[in-house]
Amino acid sequence: MEYSFSTREKNGGICLILSYKVNSKWKQKTKQGFKTLREAKQYQDKLLAAAKEDAACGADPELADITFKSFTQNIYLRDKGPSLEYSTKRNYFFMLRSIPALCDKPIREITAGDVINVYQDMGRFSEGTRKNRFAQIRAIFNYAIHPYKIITVNPADSVTQVKDKTPRRVKALTEKESLQLLDALSDTSIFYMIAFIALNTGMRYGEIAGLTWNSVNFTRQTITIDKQYNWISPEKRGFKAVKSRNGNRTIHMNTKLAARLNAWKQTVPISIDGRVIPTTPSTHALMNRQLRKLKQGISVHTLRHTFATMLLSKSKDINLVAAVLGDNVATVAATYIHYTDDIRKEADQYIETMYK
């Protein structure tokens, strides 16, 4: 490989410049911050080795010193952006904010030890948050390997992730607690309706916020869930696709819910966008705050769990519950494992009595 070194003064120090030729094209690599020419010359072998590595793997020299943060924001999210939901993009920025030790470090200089330290520091987060953010970090390093060829080994592969094997029971209300909660919310009409819908359908908050009147069929007593309402940009909320393919579903609307919705339709002006519940950007947070005043540790999502556990206990059918919730069977089985265990125990009793 044809190459030459030169130096120049920059910002009060010495900048080492390597010019080298790859496939008939001249490229440059630089390293600055040296106090003397001697220091700069001593670094020549390292800079040349880096240039040879670039030439061998085909990496763009302009990306050689790109930081983890810059690569994530300016390349990874730029390339992946069209296929990512706004909320997912926002989570990447939350992730970057939580790992300052990696953000401003060039990707090529990040070691397995650096990533291990970051992973250990993320122990302050919940298991789910830690797992998701580390998955994002790993994906970004993989993208730096292919297609950008900035590095050849993923430093995140050296991390042994901690798995919390402690069984966790989802928070769900009893039937009595559900009725008490509805009584307590009766003075706040929107909160009451959101809770009533969630407890009788298991719909997610975003699905309730995105429910429109043309998706409610009073004749057939069905609700069609084919969209949700959430942030679609930093400044705007709007309709968006449901969480997954399974999320598109039509479910039964029981007689009590049909009556409530019919009465609601007669008393509340229909919004321009046709939404049944005209939520605002603060509705979700305010309702969660109100729910926690009534019972510590619960949220709107607790009402979905409540519906699921009640339906599971009455129907004993995991496939049915998964279809109504818009989840897959594996997710339902894992989330409500304590309740599915009860079903298995009941099945054991039936098996014992067979053919007697």
Across the structure, where does each feature detected by a protein language model lie?
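Active-site/catalytic core of tyrosine-dependent DNA strand-transfer enzymes
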Residues: Q228, N254-G297
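N-terminal DNA-binding module of tyrosine recombinases/phage integrases
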Residues: K10-C15, Y20-I116, I270
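Basic, Lys/Arg- and aromatic-enriched nucleic-acid-binding interface segment
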Residues: K131, I150-V153, D157-Y205, A209-L211
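N-terminal core-binding DNA-recognition domain of tyrosine site-specific recombinases/integrases
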Residues: L77-Y143, P147-T152, P167, S189, ...
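DNA breakage-rejoining catalytic core of tyrosine-based enzymes
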Residues: R108, I150-V153, K163-D183, S233-T255, ...
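DNA/chromatin major-groove-contacting recognition/catalytic segments
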Residues: L181, E235-F239, T335-K356
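C-terminal catalytic core of tyrosine-transesterase DNA break-rejoin enzymes
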Residues: H146, F196, N200, E207, ...
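Conserved tyrosine-mediated DNA breakage-rejoining catalytic core shared by Y-recombinases
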Residues: L211-A263
